[in-house]
Amino acid sequence: MKTTTSTISNLINNSLLRCAFIIMPFVLMCVATLPGARAVSPPPDGGYPGGNTAEGTDALLSLSSGTNNTAIGADALANNVSGNDNTAVGFQALLLATGNHNTAVGSEALFFDTGGHDNTATGFQALLNNTTGIENVASGAFALINNQTGDFNTATGTGALQANIGGDANTATGTAALSDNTSGINNTANGVNALFLILLATTTPPTG
């Protein structure tokens, strides 16, 4: 009797195992086809063709042929169509940008940049109004905020060179350093409020 019972038990167990092996693939297939289990398109990492990466509402919204751009934040690089090698991190950073090789980190940094290239802006509204200026570096909130066409400027500190519009090759280090300079060139100011009241200064020697 024991042998018969054991044999029956073995047969039942083997049958259950075989059923499990047959049913399991179907179960997995059903789970995989559930809406929540499907892959997200685009993928969560925001990778797109051409080496572009976008994360955030309308980030890189207008992109067509540009390559190697990174946009993180709502509206970051939203207007970029064909610009290459730009990096925007922050709300509306590089929003209107169409140029190349620009880096903006901070809300509205390089917001109006349309033709400038090789600019670096770090901080809230740094280089906000830059349109065609090139190779500028702004680090700090409002640094070079009003620069439009000036080139080769370096501003480090909150409000440094904030009034500069078309001046070139200026260096300001410190809060509000050279903050009233609008079109002067080749100035260097180090320290808080350094050269605060300068309006126009050049390296051109006086004549006469």
Give, region by region, the residue ranges found by the protein language model:
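Glycine- and small/polar-enriched repetitive beta-structure motifs of secreted/surface proteins
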Residues: 1-208
